[in-house]
Amino acid sequence: MNQVYESWMKGGHQHVATCSDCHVPEGFVSKWLFKAENGLHHGYAVTFKQNPVSFQATDKGKNIIQNNCIACHSEYAAYSIDATMKKGAPGSEPLSCVSCHRQVGHAHNF
């Protein structure tokens, strides 16, 4: 986890956003359900020594990050992101904020 924190410190949002600002959903109920679920997963991983070596966002996590980008940057995102556009060959993922701004939150790809 230290590598993730260090890369955030080198990224573009270290002075304006915390981990939760990008990685936790907005809204009281959504936020606390998310924190409870992640706390259980983290507790299990630590207890049974199954900490991931690398971190990859799940589809749910990618959706949360996208929604939080749009929430903070709504004045730009409303005119910039067309989720129906594809970034590559047919069948590839739709474009998202991090399709182009991959290293904004972290200086390295996590």
Give the ranges of each region predicted by the language model.
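Short sequence/structural segments immediately N-terminal
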Residues: 1-110
